[in-house]
């Protein structure tokens, strides 16, 4: 049933979905532009073809290079964060994964919150905000879950240098650990 739902969207609104893939294990993978995500989720939640759908997880990950080639266009960005929404239909046991395609706007602007549609998204968006630094527009609860208040670090973002700036060396004379600048020896 969901296959026909997404095929109908691809036929009537081709600019909403960039890619649509269905698998044997009742999983559907959709690559969506982030400005259509909220409206597609509203349609998923309140349409009769997918009556009992729930949001299971929102997660993000980082890659060294993120480039996706689809049949319609090529997406290649310097941003390395991908945001994935995981939905589950309780009646048909279908799983839907919505992947945000416009990754450059994920880091530069705020994503629209799904808090009005799914109550579980409040907690999941707080996790993403805290761990990856992703901001959500319209979010009411901005408390931290795990980090201390005032801590602006994002532990899951790989913003550290790939080459060490200092080395940790054990000094036998002073019987302590010493940080020395990294040097290459010839």
Language-model regions, residue ranges each:
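Terminal low-complexity/charged segments
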Residues: 1-186
């Amino acid at each position: 049933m969901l296959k026909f739902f997404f095929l109908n969207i691809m036929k009537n609104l081709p600019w909403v979905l960039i890619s649509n893939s269905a698998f044997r294990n009742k999983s559907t993978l959709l690559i969506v532009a982030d400005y259509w995500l909220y409206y597609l989720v509203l349609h998923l939640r309140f349409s009769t073809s997918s009556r009992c759908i729930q949001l299971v997880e929102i997660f993000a990950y980082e890659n060294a290079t993120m480039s996706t080639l689809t049949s319609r266009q090529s997406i290649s960005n310097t941003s390395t964060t991908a945001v994935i929404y995981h939905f589950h239909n309780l009646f048909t046991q279908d799983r839907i994964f919505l992947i945000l395609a416009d990754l450059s706007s994920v880091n530069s602007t705020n994503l629209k919150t799904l808090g009005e549609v799914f109550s579980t998204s409040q907690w999941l968006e707080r996790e993403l905000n805290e761990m990856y630094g992703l901001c959500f527009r319209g979010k009411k609860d901005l408390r931290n879950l795990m980090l201390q208040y005032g801590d602006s670090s994002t532990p899951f973002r790989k913003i550290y240098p790939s080459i060490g700036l200092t080395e940790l060396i054990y000094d036998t004379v002073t019987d302590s650990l010493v940080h020395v600048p990294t040097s290459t020896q010839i």
